Amino acid sequence: MSSQYSNVENLSPQTIRQVMRELQEMETTPPEGIKVLINESDVTDIQALIDGPAGTPYAAGIFRVKLTLNKDFPQTPPKAYFLTKIFHPNVAANGEICVNTLKKDWKPDLGIKHILLTIKCLLIVPNPESALNEEAGKMLLERYDDYSQRARMMTEIHAQPAKCAAGAAGDSKDDDGPSTKKHAGLDKKLQDKKKEKLLKEKKRMLKRL
């Protein structure tokens, strides 16, 4: 899912400065519900935490997303992935995100902030017509209650704050870099409490079945 190498050396100094400036602005004045995670050693590897929007099955969850800039950025769009597992029509099994902004509607003057806001909006209004997860797309259209319950359960299992804090800053899999170790032990007590809450919620859901 992630690139094996950095594209920093392939980007123009102007593009690097532009990306760093935008990331620093978002760090200072973050968009509502979005926290950018800056990797100063590789601006082509951008991660952010997105709060699940209220009133959706993703509410109360925190989702880690990753943008990977290619050497032709901003002439071509970055790749976008959910590193946090999620049940959503427009997110593939490998986490890749399908949204028109990153495909046919891409424009070079669209910035990182716009992309992250678009991804957040996708949590509010999924597009089942261009589903990468066909099961989720069909369920959303035909059995919304089942879709909502499935998405909510995935959120409770995978998108809790402690899990996001423990996620790898470089990748969702086998990255043992300094950032991973730095976050891996955060808030163990909070994580234990979330596990207890999840078990109680599962019991309640089983009773309703």
From Swiss-Prot:
Composition-biased stretches (Basic and acidic residues): 171-199
Protein origin, superkingdom: Eukaryota
Catalytic residues in the record: C98 (glycyl thioester intermediate)
A GO molecular function held by the record: ubiquitin conjugating enzyme activity
Region described as Disordered: 164-209
UniProt pathway: Protein modification; protein ubiquitination
Database matches in InterPro entries: Ub_conjugating_enzyme (IPR050113), UBQ-conjugat_E2_core (IPR000608), UBQ-conjugating_AS (IPR023313), UBQ-conjugating_enzyme/RWD (IPR016135)
CDD domains: UBCc_UBE2S
Protein's UniProt keywords contain Cell division: yes
Family matches, as PROSITE patterns: UBC_1 (PS00183), UBC_2 (PS50127)
All residue ranges annotated as the UBC core domain in the record: 14-160
UniProt enzyme class: transferase
Any Pfam family: UQ_con
Key words of the record: ATP-binding, Cell cycle, Cell division, Nucleotide-binding, Transferase, Ubl conjugation pathway
Function per UniProt: Catalyzes the covalent attachment of ubiquitin to other proteins. Acts as an essential factor of the anaphase promoting complex/cyclosome (APC/C), a cell cycle-regulated ubiquitin ligase that controls progression through mitosis. Acts by specifically elongating polyubiquitin chains initiated by the E2 enzyme vih/UbcH10 on APC/C substrates, enhancing the degradation of APC/C substrates by the proteasome and promoting mitotic exit.
Name of this chain's protein: Ubiquitin-conjugating enzyme E2 S
Organism: Drosophila ananassae
